[in-house]
Amino acid sequence: MDQAELARIFQMFDRNGDGKITKQELNDSLENLGIYIPDKDLVQMIEKIDLNGDGYVDIEEFGGLYQTIMEERDEEEDMREAFNVFDQNRDGFITVEELRSVLASLGLKQGRTLEDCKRMISKVDVDGDGMVNFKEFKQMMKGGGFAALGSNL
């Protein structure tokens, strides 16, 4: 994102145009977007963003916040793409058969048998349905992925 676009977004939050976003301006802007945050949480949010400690969010501080939001969104998109590689029928779950198929196509020795794949899935299957949903997949990927799960089979 270029600086001009960031400045436009900042100006939408900076209602009075004084170059800084107050707690009230942040609250009003978020509410206009349909986001309602309790007052104490808003204070904490500003304290995290407010690097110079003046009690306001200026354009530089806002840029850091916006960058963090965008990076998290990009990571989520990457994670979704990876999940979709395994979720071959696009039903929102990775089954034992789908896992075995993908691992085999990658030429990995982990997961050659259905039993291996069942064990791998059971290590991350929080809800016990025998499949991996997107939330479970994200948790697993943060721990090293399916290959890490298979290393101690």
Curated annotation (Swiss-Prot):
Family: Belongs to the calmodulin family.
Record key words, sorted: Calcium, Metal-binding, Repeat
Organism: Arabidopsis thaliana
SMART domains linked to this entry: EFh
Name by which UniProt lists this protein: Calmodulin-like protein 3
Record domain EF-hand: where: 1-36, 37-72, 74-109, 112-147
Coiled coil: none
Annotated residues for binding of Ca(2+) 2: 50, 52, 54, 56, 61
Residues given in the record as Ca(2+) 1 binding sites: 14, 16, 18, 20, 25
Top-level taxon of origin: Eukaryota
Sample GO molecular function, one term: calcium ion binding
Cysteines engaged in disulfide bonds, as pairs: none
Job description of the protein: Potential calcium sensor.
GO annotations of cellular component type: peroxisome
Amino-acid positions noted as binding Ca(2+) 4 in the UniProt annotation, renumbered to this chain: 125, 127, 129, 131, 136
Chain residues that bind Ca(2+) 3: 87, 89, 91, 98
